[in-house]
Design a protein with these regions (language model features):
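Active-site machinery of serine-nucleophile hydrolases
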Residues: 2-56
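Solvent-exposed loop/turn segments at secondary-structure junctions
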Residues: 8-12, 44-49, 79-83, 104-108, ...
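Short, proline-enriched alpha-helix->beta-strand connector loops that line the catalytic pocket
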Residues: 35, 114-120
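Short, solvent-exposed loop/turn and secondary-structure capping segments
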Residues: 13-19, 51-53, 87-88, 110-113, ...
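C-terminal catalytic histidine-bearing segment of alpha/beta-hydrolase fold enzymes
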Residues: 123, 127-137, 141, 146-167
Length: 167
């Protein structure tokens, strides 16, 4: 299995080598679920197309270089890293078994994600200090609408899409 975790501001490259590992515990937490899971925690240079393309290239490289089950490749994006993750989900949603978007906004196009039916779990605080909760709520509603337009049942949608808004 492979878990790719994309950092927020504190984990960007200019913050210093390894700062993403000191400021965010997503990769360490993922190992609690699967001790054999390979963790990739790149330090991005931005939250845009360049980092999205680099994330995809890194994932493809790791899949080719290591014995990783392609059905167990997961992506996580926190804060600005979630913006990058949403662009990755626009470009190559089928590369990942699921995506965890935390305290972020959705910058990518949701159509390719809906077509691929890659499961997404969105988590945000109701009063998130940077983004607020509205951006993820809006993305959730838009993606839910796309699934409804595709004829999916509520049970099928619930298997693919979760919005967890914390008080």
């Amino acid at each position: 299995a492979l878990f790719v975790t994309l950092p927020g501001y504190e984990g960007l490259y200019f913050q210093g080598v390894g700062s993403n590992l000191r400021s965010e515990a997503f990769g360490f937490e993922a190992q609690q679920y699967n001790a054999q899971m390979l963790i990739a925690a790149p330090q991005l240079g931005d939250w845009g197309e360049t980092s999205a393309d680099q994330t995809i290239a890194l994932t493809e490289y790791l899949l080719s270089a290591y014995n990783i089950d392609p059905q167990k490749v997961y992506l996580n994006g926190y804060s600005g890293g979630g913006e990058t993750g949403s662009l990755v989900m626009e470009k190559r949603p089928q590369l990942y078994a699921a995506y965890l978007a935390v305290s972020t906004q959705w910058d990518g196009d949701l159509q390719p994600l809906a077509a691929a039916r890659t499961p997404v779990y969105m988590a945000v605080g109701e009063e998130d200090s940077y983004y607020g909760s509205e951006p993820l709520k809006s993305a959730y509603e838009e993606l839910r609408g796309l699934y409804m337009d595709m004829g999916l049942t509520q049970a099928q949608i619930n298997d693919l899409l979760v919005l967890d808004v914390k008080d």
